[in-house]
Amino acid sequence: MYSAEISRKNPGCFIFLLDQSASMEDPFGGSSDRRKADELATIINKLIHNLSIRCAKGDSMYDYFHVGVIGYGQDTVVKSAFDGALTGKDLIPISDLANNPLRIEDRTKKADDGAGGLVEQTVKFPLWFEPRHVGGTPMSSAFKMAAEIVQRWVAEHPKAFPPS
């Protein structure tokens, strides 16, 4: 069992590998209207949004986590999957990530109406990643890149909780 505590002095590290190859254009779970790439983008965007919320206290954002996202597929290229202001960065403090989505979209979700039913609500949803589905699947190269990033991060944070 690890005794390291995640804090601003000892942040945690998350690295996500996103398959962005041509196979991600396939339907998700037998559905004809949602592709695997669509679901993956939604999931990673929700996950980053939830991590951001967990690190917010009032108007302040605390860097409890550093996050890396590696995309692999397009032209068999393996690289940081961030776009916009974060292009080319491989590991980002959560505050920088939270403050730099590609855009914010209006989405509809169902919520409890307080009387046992559901009502649709429009919510703001930050997007960091768009669905992509091009090229081959250089997964082993993605793992190699992740290992290099983790090795560098661990050297910089020797007392931190192990990366996930």
What do the predicted segments below correspond to?
Residues 1-38, 151-154:
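Acidic, polar low-complexity linker/tail segments
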Residues 1-8, 53-61, 148-162:
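Surface-exposed acidic, glycine-flexible loop patches that form ligand/cofactor-binding
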Residues 11, 37, 41-44, 136, ...:
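Generic preference for well-ordered alpha-helical elements
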Residues 16-21, 40, 69, 146-147, ...:
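DG-centered beta-turn motif at the end of beta-strands
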Residues 23-64:
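…and closely analogous acidic/polar surface helices at protein-protein or active-site interfaces
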Residues 25, 42, 52-53, 63-65, ...:
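Divalent cation-coordinating acidic motifs and surrounding scaffolds
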Residues 94-161:
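Von Willebrand factor
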